[in-house]
Structures are given as structure tokens and as C-alpha cells.
């Protein structure tokens, strides 16, 4: 329930920032601050030099945050083109299919689970639902008519791969650091830094307009 609300709010914010990257930066920065406060209250020991000196830095410290950037920014690009409902459905479909692949093959250190007929039937129902939603969608919510909607559906499906991979990576980091809240903080911090750099490169401004721009 919260995902489409978050996406809609961030999409609205991007109309004032004039940049999807900038809107995502603000979203990640707020999340980072909240997680930092939680870590200070619940696990202050994870923020000490002694704790960091005992850790082994690897891809789990970086990749999770970058995948979060891809997913959040991707949703901001998709929402004005597909609408909230179809954006959520197509990305969730990608999440479920990637989640099934990770479980079936035990990728990224995940516990391997066998593929069942029920999972297959569920995926078929999801794809059928997307087809019906696209079929009855006679009036596009945007003016991007030059690009076929199938293209954006495919992009949304691929963007949906990011969250289950990110969750698996962050889970591994949480096991190594013995703190899921700290793992989330690292993920958000990396995402915030990456988005801030992208904002400076592509937007070249940190101004927020008082009037919004219709996407």
C-alpha cells in the first residue's frame, strides 16, 4: 500500500526539483537521516571506529544502495508514463520473478528453495493481469505517445529486478554486521551519495522551484 504512495509523492517532488535524480536524492537523504537516528538510539556501537575496523568491505556495502537508486529513480520515470497502478504491478511482477529465480538457484547466498507449480501459476496470473490492465487502458496518463507503452512496461519489468537483489545483498550485509538497521543505513548512505553526484552532473543545480513543472 505504501509503495504507490511513496512513488506518487516522489513524482510530485520531481516536478518542483525539475529532476528525478534530485527528487530521489532528497528521498534517500531523509531515509538516511532517519536510519542514522535509529542506529544512534538502538545500536550506537556500530558507529564507532572499533566496529568499522573489524569489518571486511566488499560488494555488499555498495551494490545494495546502487540498486535502490536504480529502482526509485526508475519508478519516478515510469509513473507519469504508466500511471501508479500499472507502475506498481509491472515492477512487482519483476520483483516476484527475480525473487523466484534467486530462491530457485540460491543466488547471492540465498537459501535455495524448489520451484513449485503454485509459483508458476502465480506468475502466469500476474502476467495475465498486466495484459488486461494494458488492454483496458484506453486513455494514457501522459503525452509520451511517441514511445510504445510496451517499451515502458519492459523497462519497468527490468527495474523490478532490483529490489529482490538488493534485499538479498542487504540481508547478507546484515548477517556480517549483525545489524539489519545498520545494513539499511549503509544502503541508504551509498544511494544518497550516488544520487547527489548524479544530480550535480545532470542537474547542475540544487535549487527547488516554487512552481511545479508538469511532466
Give residue spans per PLM region:
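Extracytoplasmic gate region of multi-pass secondary transporters
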Residues: 159, 163-171, 175
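Hydrophobic/aromatic residues within the transmembrane alpha-helices of Major Facilitator Superfamily
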Residues: 1-5, 33, 66, 93, ...
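Membrane-interface interhelical linkers
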Residues: 1, 5, 9-15, 21-25, ...
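C-terminal transmembrane-helix exit sites in multi-pass transporters
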Residues: 91, 97-117
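Residue positions within transmembrane alpha-helices of multi-pass solute transporters
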Residues: 5, 9, 37, 70, ...
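Hydrophobic transmembrane alpha-helices of multi-pass small-molecule transport proteins
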Residues: 115-136
Amino acid at each position: 500500500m505504501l509503495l504507490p504512495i511513496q512513488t506518487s509523492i516522489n513524482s510530485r517532488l520531481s516536478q518542483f526539483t525539475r529532476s528525478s535524480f534530485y527528487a530521489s536524492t532528497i528521498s534517500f537523504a531523509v531515509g538516511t537521516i532517519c536510519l542514522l537516528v535509529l542506529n544512534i538510539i538502538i545500536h550506537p556501537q556500530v558507529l564507532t571506529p572499533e566496529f568499522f575496523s573489524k569489518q571486511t568491505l566488499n560488494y555488499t556495502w555498495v551494490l545494495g544502495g546502487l540498486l535502490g537508486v536504480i529502482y526509485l529513480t526508475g519508478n519516478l520515470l515510469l509513473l507519469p508514463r504508466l500511471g501508479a497502478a500499472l507502475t506498481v504491478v509491472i515492477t512487482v511482477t519483476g520483483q516476484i520473478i527475480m525473487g523466484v529465480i534467486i530462491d530457485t538457484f540460491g543466488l547471492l547466498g540465498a537459501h535455495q528453495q524448489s520451484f513449485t507449480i503454485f509459483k508458476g501459476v502465480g506468475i502466469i496470473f500476474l502476467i495475465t493481469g498486466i495484459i488486461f490492465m494494458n488492454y483496458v487502458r484506453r486513455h494514457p496518463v501522459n503525452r509520451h505517445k511517441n514511445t510504445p507503452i510496451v517499451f515502458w512496461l519492459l523497462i519497468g519489468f527490468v527495474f523490478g529486478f532490483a529490489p529482490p537483489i538488493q534485499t538479498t545483498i542487504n540481508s547478507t550485509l546484515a548477517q556480517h554486521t549483525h545489524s539489519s538497521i545498520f545494513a539499511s543505513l549503509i544502503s541508504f548512505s551509498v544511494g544518497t551519495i550516488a544520487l547527489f553526484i548524479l544530480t550535480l552532473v545532470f542537474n547542475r543545480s540544487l535549487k527547488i522551484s516554487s512552481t511545479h513543472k508538469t511532466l
